[in-house]
Swiss-Prot record:
InterPro entries reported in the protein's UniProt record: Flu_C_NS2, Flu_NS2
Record-given protein name: Nuclear export protein
A GO-annotated cellular component: virion component
Subunit structure: Interacts with protein M1. May interact with host nucleoporin RAB/HRB and exportin XPO1/CRM1.
Keywords per UniProt: Host nucleus, Host-virus interaction, Transport, Virion
Localization (cell): Virion; Host nucleus
Coiled coil: none
Function summary: Mediates the nuclear export of encapsidated genomic RNAs (ribonucleoproteins, RNPs). Acts as an adapter between viral RNPs complexes and the nuclear export machinery of the cell. Possesses no intrinsic RNA-binding activity, but includes a C-terminal M1-binding domain. This domain is believed to allow recognition of RNPs bound to the protein M1.
Highest classification ranks of the organism: Viruses, Riboviria, Orthornavirae, Negarnaviricota, Polyploviricotina
Intervals of motif Nuclear export signal: 96-105, 122-132
Family membership: Belongs to the influenza viruses NEP family.
Main localization of the protein described in the UniProt heading: virion
Gene Ontology biological process: exit of virus from host cell nucleus through nuclear pore
Amino acid sequence: MSDKTVKSTNLMAFVATKMLERQEDLDTCTEMQVEKMKTSTKARLKTESSFAPRTWEDAIKDEILRRSVDTSSLDKWPELKQELENVSDALKADSLWLPMKSLSLYSKVSNQEPSSIPIGEMKHQILTRLKLICSRLEKLDLNLSKAVLGIQNSEDLILIIYNRDVCKNTILMIKSLCNSLI
C-alpha cells in the first residue's frame, strides 16, 4: 500500500517539476517576445511618426491623385457601368468577368455608411457573407483552442494564443459591422 503511495507521489512530483520547467520556458520565451515586440514597435514608430494621421476623405483624395484620376471621371459612373454590361459574350466567358461585374455592383455604395446601404437583396447578401465568415472564424478559434492542448513548443503556443486573439477581435468587428447593417 505504501509502495503505491510513493509511486503516485513520485509521479505527481515529476509532473509538477515538468510543469514548472515548462512555465519557466514560457516565461523566458514570453520575455523574449515582449522585447522583440518593443524593439519592432519602436522601429515602426520611428518610421511612421513622420506621417500625420489622416481621415478616410484624405486617403480617398490621395488615392485619386495617385492614380491621376480627376473627380469628373467619377461622375461618368453610369456610362462606365453601361459599358461593363454591354461587354461581348467572349469576355463574359473569361474568368475575370464575374469578379469585375460583382465589383462594379458594389462599388457604387462603397462611400456610404453601412447603415445607409439600401435594404434589400444586397444588404441580405452582405449580412449572409459576414455571418458565414464569422462562423468560420469561430470554428478556427475552436480548433486553435483544441490545438493548444497538444503543443510541445512554447513558440507555437505563443503563435496560437496570438492567432486566437486575432480571431476573437475579428469576430467582434464583424459582429459590430453586422449590427450596424441591421
